[in-house]
């Protein structure tokens, strides 16, 4: 065992002495060391209940002959960080979390890990760190929040964001907005729709890194506690059998996850996180081109928020991820999982599917997969749109560019009534390095939707979007403006042509004009001069490479 390096032999008496200072007995020190990576915090609703899951996981570890050691990582709430300087820290926090997991596990000789994340960047961050170590681990995702209810209608956080736009154009009163604000998020859990947190939980289960039904089981359900306890027991088995992530994860495992993502209409942020996870195994293991190739393989089979009407709680009652895998069975490749069962064995155990929630592939919600990769002279290295959340009339759009160099400028223009039907809003210098931090543009997109412009106005950016964004929102444009990408030379009034079905996005000027503008472009200074974000801006890769540090 790895832990033998710090606890065996006479020379390790000082190490054992310090462990005994923590209250551990000789018998406990002899057992496998299991790190319990808890991201509990009192400021993130998706994480306020994680202490309960950590306690259950520790009981499971003890029950199966291991010794648990709990430690914490940070957790950022994207919703609370939204719309201000805090959002610069959201995506970069993923790398801090990965480094924390790596550092703590290496420093203390853990033989295996139980990861307990919930929200957007914490799920991929923890997994990235664990993959880097290549030691046995299992993931307990925190679980979804229930939707709120008011006057017989269901709400979630996106309802509140869009409510701001509705209030601004007089559709609702301030009192009605306050009612929605108060009811929309009723308690613990990651936001109730198929936004980034729940998308990543679903893909974690598909990858075989968490137990079946973990992703969709509600945050405070007793079954989630039982899953946590069983996960604690299972990690001891994985350590004793020396089953590492590289024994489980293959190219096919990642392709399964992408297929589920595309079929469900998951968050566009998955095109950052899945390549970033794969990068920890091998560079170029999974790229944006894999998403592009696979998006023609499956239709969109679930009408989940933000593009549809159903919530993750509905997906759970419909059969969860095993049911989705069952419906996609002809496309899914077999792979091993931490449960000890293969993907095909999990599929064969499915007993119930609600086809009103998870549609058969021959009767899909949309014939087109939920995400689409576009390329063109604006985005030579690609960009992404969550097409499942786009009105079909906007699949093809051509209009004049309204150019802004920050999110703040854009919001002022939208709420000030300066954006008109037919416009293409361009937000640049918001990429991984340009932001820095690649902020989510949820406030601008929600304002556009709330004001009723989502069926006539497109928005493109080198930044990214919340998993809760809907409408014709095209993000991750690569190369980003800060790297001298063509988005940097778009001028006010230029005509932009978007054709989602053809996978194209182009600036309607000549190649000669593009070359001339690029030759005259001057790189601006980094917006943040000190601290972590300034260092991040110097090291981060392009969005089409997962925005990893290199």
From Swiss-Prot:
The keyword Glycosyltransferase does not apply. This is Dihydroxy-acid dehydratase. InterPro entries: Dihydro-acid_dehy_C, DihydroxyA_deHydtase, DiOHA_6PGluconate_deHydtase_CS, ILV_EDD_C, ILV_EDD_N, IlvD/EDD_N. The active site is at residue 466. GO terms for cellular component: cytosol. It comes from Methanococcus aeolicus (strain ATCC BAA-1280 / DSM 17508 / OCM 812 / Nankai-3). Homodimer. Pfam families: ILV_EDD_C (PF24877), ILVD_EDD_N (PF00920). It comes from the Archaea. Pathway: Amino-acid biosynthesis; L-isoleucine biosynthesis; L-isoleucine from 2-oxobutanoate: step 3/4; Amino-acid biosynthesis; L-valine biosynthesis; L-valine from pyruvate: step 3/4. The gene is ilvD.
């Amino acid at each position: 065992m790895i832990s033998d390096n710090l606890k065996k032999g006479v020379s390790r008496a000082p190490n054992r002495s310090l462990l005994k200072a923590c209250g551990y007995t000789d018998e406990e020190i002899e057992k496998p060391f299991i790190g319990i990576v808890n991201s509990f915090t009192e400021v993130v609703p998706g994480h306020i209940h994680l202490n309960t899951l950590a306690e259950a996981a520790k009981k499971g570890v003890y029950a199966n002959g291991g010794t648990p050691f709990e430690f914490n990582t940070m957790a950022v709430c994207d919703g609370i960080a939204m719309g201000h300087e805090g959002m610069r820290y959201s995506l970069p926090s993923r790398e801090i979390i990965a480094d924390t997991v790596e550092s703590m596990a290496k420093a203390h000789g853990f033989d295996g890990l139980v990861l307990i994340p919930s929200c957007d960047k914490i799920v991929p961050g923890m997994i990235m760190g664990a993959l880097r170590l290549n030691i046995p681990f299992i993931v307990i995702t925190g679980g979804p929040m229930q939707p709120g209810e008011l006057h017989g209608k269901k709400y979630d956080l996106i309802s509140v964001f869009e409510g701001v736009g509705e209030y601004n154009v007089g559709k609702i009163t301030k009192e009605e907005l306050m009612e929605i604000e108060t009811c929309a998020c009723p308690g613990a859990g990651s936001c109730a729709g198929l936004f980034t947190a729940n998308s990543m939980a679903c893909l974690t289960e598909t990858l075989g890194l968490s137990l079946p039904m973990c992703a969709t089981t509600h945050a405070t359900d007793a079954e989630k506690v039982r899953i946590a306890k069983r996960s604690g027991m299972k990690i001891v088995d994985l350590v004793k059998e020396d089953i590492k992530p590289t024994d489980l994860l293959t190219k096919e495992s990642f392709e399964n996850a992408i297929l589920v993502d595309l079929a469900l209409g998951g968050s566009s942020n998955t095109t950052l996180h899945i390549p970033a996870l794969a990068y920890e195994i091998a560079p170029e293991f999974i790229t944006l081109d894999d998403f592009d190739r696979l998006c023609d393989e499956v239709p969109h089979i679930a009408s989940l928020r933000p593009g549809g009407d159903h919530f993750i709680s509905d997906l759970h009652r419909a059969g969860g991820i095993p049911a989705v895998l069952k419906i996609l069975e002809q496309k899914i490749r077999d792979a091993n999982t931490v449960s000890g069962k293969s993907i095909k064995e999990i599929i064969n155990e499915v007993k119930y599917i609600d086809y009103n929630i998870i549609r058969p592939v021959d009767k899909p919600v949309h014939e087109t997969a939920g995400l689409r990769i576009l390329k063109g002279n604006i985005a030579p290295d690609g960009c992404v749109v969550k097409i499942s959340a786009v009105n079909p009339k906007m699949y093809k759009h051509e209009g004049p560019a309204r150019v802004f160099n920050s999110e703040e400028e854009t919001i002022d223009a939208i709420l000030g009534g300066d954006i008109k039907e037919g416009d293409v809003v361009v937000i640049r210098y918001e990429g991984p390095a340009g932001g820095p931090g690649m902020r989510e543009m949820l406030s601008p997109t929600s304002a556009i939707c709330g004001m009723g412009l989502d069926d006539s106005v497109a928005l493109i950016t080198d930044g990214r979007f919340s998993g809760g964004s809907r409408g014709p929102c095209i993000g991750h444009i690569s190369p980003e403006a800060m790297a001298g990408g063509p988005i940097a030379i778009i001028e006010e009034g230029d005509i932009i042509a978007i054709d989602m079905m053809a996978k194209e996005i182009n600036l309607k000027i000549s190649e000669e004009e593009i070359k001339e503008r690029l030759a005259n472009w001057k790189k601006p200074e980094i917006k943040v001069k000190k601290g972590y974000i300034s260092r991040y801006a110097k090291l981060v890769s392009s969005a089409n490479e997962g925005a990893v540090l290199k």
